Amino acid sequence: MKLLKSTASLGGEILEMDLSQKLSQEQINFLNQCWNDRLVLVFKKQNLDDNKLINFSKNFGELDPPGPNPYGVKFLPEFPEINVISNVKNKEGTPIGNLGDGEAVWHADMTYQETPPKAGILYALEVPENQGNTHFANMTLAYDELPNKLKQKIDGKTLIHDSAHNSACLLYTSPSPRDSGKSR
């Protein structure tokens, strides 16, 4: 197992690791160390079914269910931990997943929760030939690079928002976390 570091401020590719197999504690420790150092890890050419994806994910802690979606549909009811993200529609024109074309604009996952998940795992079944258009930002570095005057102005402040709308401003059909006292 190896880490190939990106030249960017975050990111790295994990080499020589088969995620479909049960990981040893040494491998889990290695991945945690790499993740803490690089913030985003890429594992190419993996072959995981839904169970194996969940088993791999559980190596890093308890899994959070996905947030609400605008369709009010559980796309994989047998795997409630998995959020299907797709721009594909079935024959009837119904989306087969969340975040279709136009919705997945710049965002941070599930930050409306009191304690947002510490990580997300994105497993791509199909990747465009141009490698898609997904980007990640090092928000710790962004904060560190702010002018001291701005840091003083915002330190101690809290932002409150909810999940009533998605990133494309579509109203979700699921209840807002505010209704259950879960908002941030």
Task: Give residue spans per PLM region.
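Hydrophobic, aromatic-enriched interface-forming segments
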Residues: 133-171
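Non-heme Fe(II)-dependent double-stranded beta-helix
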Residues: 1-134
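Conserved small/polar residues in nucleotide/adenosyl-binding loops
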Residues: 172-179
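Short coil/turn linker and secondary-structure boundary residues
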Residues: 23, 48, 146-149, 175
